[in-house]
Amino acid sequence: VSSGTPKETVTPLVVELWYAEAPELGDPRLLQALRLQWPATELQMESIVVPHGDPASPLLTVIMTASPLGEGGKALPDVSQTWDWEGAEAAVSASRCSLLVTEMFGDGRTPQERWDAMSAVVCEMAQLTRPTALSWPQSQRVGDPELFAAGDLDGLINVRYFSISNDPGAIVMDTLGLHVFGLPDVQCHYRDREPGEIAAMLFSTAVYLFRSGDVIADGNTISGPRGDERFVCIHERALLAPSRQVIDVDLGEPYAAGQRDRR
């Protein structure tokens, strides 16, 4: 890890399930179905609480009704950085209300432990309640609920794409989502390469960080998409919002864009 580079703050995971008409969280049939998987599931203060692991110190998944559209700036999710679901815009347009799924007591747990717990509940809720769309506000991605499975990292980690208006041909791509675990995302500022191959490289690197931690030190290299390519990595602040730590992947000449200090 780059010395002197501040670590990100760990924040609770959030997944939003969108509906044309939201299910009633107090429905005994819903609670009964969840208890088949998690027997200690309870209805508390109009929220469903699902405990995982040690009963004395459980990781909790909490399901609650989200604020209505328009209240406090509440809006439908943005689909502009969702690239792999053609039906995203139509599904979101048909949505009118949502449930929030979040977590409590995630500190001290590995990213895998936290996501295994959260994603299992999201998957079960998607099967039981049939939402129109899943939204990951922390990664700016919208997903098809019918394709989501427990443990899937698609959605948790999103690869974004931006063209740079004042530098024709230059592109910035980054991952978004690892910052909630206190881990760096991955970015690449480049030109004249196929975006699909860069996206695959960034996603696979982000998955490696998710599973292994922030183990890519400044000056280390990762494999590129083509044959024996090796690209140097360095920690820095993200070029694009939200402000966070990233690992920048330098494609070298002639593909790297922007200004770099390679001393």
Regions found by a protein language model. Give the residues of each.
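Aromatic/basic-lined ligand-recognition segments
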Residues: 137-263
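Short, extreme N-terminal segment that most often corresponds to the first beta-strand
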Residues: 1-47, 245-263
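Internal, hydrophobic cores of structured domains that mediate oligomerization or house catalytic pockets
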Residues: 64-164
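Short cationic amphipathic helices and targeting signals
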Residues: 12-21, 98-101, 186-189
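N-terminal low-complexity, intrinsically disordered segments
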Residues: 20-91
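Short acidic, S/G/P-rich loop/turn micro-motifs used as interaction or catalytic elements
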Residues: 23-25, 106-109, 193-196
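Structural alpha-beta junctions
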Residues: 36-45, 120-134, 208-217
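Short, well-ordered alpha-helical segments
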Residues: 28, 116-119, 196-201
